A protein has these predicted regions:
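Short hydrophobic alpha-helices and adjacent helix-cap/hinge residues
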Residues: 1-331
């Protein structure tokens, strides 16, 4: 009996040694540095100046770090700037697919369509997409390989008119800078809102970068009192240029963004909040989720930013009550 027990003990010892030996490579593999995913963040505009903060990009990086993704260590990020050219954007997408990358972050619906035409397998996350329902089919359960954040840009135009009137009660003629995005459906509502505020809208279409100068000259000819820039992917690369022309023509300006570039004020979805939420999308996808698992979300946090330097350059004095409403004052 003692021999049988000893034999079983020896057998168990041998089996334990064998199993431990077989497990060693797995333990060693788990302890080796893991796979470092490579993603791409593409912008349609120009690279930001090192002297100017980018709330969106800063919050995106911070959001990744908070989730354990440290650039250069646990994640590699390919940053690309299309410098206002959709053709260049398409070339950059093709380049990144060949690299390859595991995920594409793109600025809007227009660029998402370009990326979607180039790949149906690489997940695409949209930073601020208009008409996302048409792009993904279902906001609750996106089809194919696209998800991200939607915009409420058309609805914001009504708030922009109200803010202009509150900040500058004497404004009666508002130049509306319009690009390629469709605003025909909401235009009658915009006109009715303006009329109720004692203002008249003057529409100026710019669909080519060379047309900005002539458009602003026409605004001056029409004796516009202020400028409202509509949310449009076409304008994304040119906020500094638009701001400079508005200042040159003495037009207080407002848009969904642009205050950092020199607009008098901007009101729109918080860039910092967007950056954090895009980081969350990236985190979920890198951990195994698919775009279909991640519903398209609407913006929930909005910010009023007022550029006091622009106000001073225009000789404007804004009321303390209005300034108190601002989420950020640029001094």
């Amino acid at each position: 009996m003692r021999h049988a027990i000893a034999w079983r003990t020896e057998l168990l010892t041998v089996m334990l040694i064998v199993l431990t030996t077989l497990r060693l490579p797995l333990v060693a593999a788990a302890q080796r540095p893991g796979h470092v995913p490579r993603i791409a963040f593409l912008e349609l505009n120009f690279p930001p100046s090192t002297s100017e903060p980018s709330p969106l990009l800063d919050a995106f990086r911070q959001g990744l770090r908070e989730r354990g993704w440290v650039e250069g260590h646990t994640i590699a990020i390919e940053w690309r700037w299309a410098e206002g050219s959709l053709e260049r954007f398409a070339s950059l997408v093709a380049e990144l697919i060949r690299l390859p990358v595991e995920l594409l972050v793109v600025p809007n619906s227009q660029t998402a369509r370009i990326a979607k035409e180039a790949t149906t397998t690489i997940p695409i996350v949209v930073v601020a997409g208009g008409g996302m329902d048409r792009l993904v089919g279902s906001l609750a359960r996106p089809r194919e390989n696209v998800t991200g954040l939607a915009t409420m840009t058309p609805e914001l135009t009504l708030t922009h008119l109200e803010l202009l009137k509150e900040a500058l009660p004497g404004v009666t003629r508002v130049a509306v800078l319009r690009g390629l995005a469709p605003y025909d459906a909401i235009w009658p509502t915009m006109e009715a809102t303006a009329q109720s505020l004692g203002m008249e809208l003057q529409r100026f279409d710019v669909r080519d970068p060379t047309a900005f100068d002539s458009a602003f000259a026409a605004m001056t000819e029409a004796q516009a009192d202020a400028l409202m820039v509509l949310g449009d992917a076409f304008f994304v690369p040119y906020p500094a240029r638009i701001a400079a022309l508005a200042l040159q023509h003495r037009l207080p300006s407002i848009g969904p963004g642009g205050a950092q570039a020199g607009y008098l004020m901007s009101y729109g979805a918080s860039e910092s909040d967007r950056g954090q939420r895009i980081a969350a999308y990236v985190d979920h996808i890198l951990k195994g989720a698919t775009p279909a698992d991640l519903p398209v979300e609407q913006p929930t946090k909005f910010e009023l930013v007022i550029n006091l330097k622009t106000a001073q350059s225009l000789g404007l004095t804004l009321s303390p009550v209005f300034l108190f409403r601002a989420d950020e004052l640029i001094k």
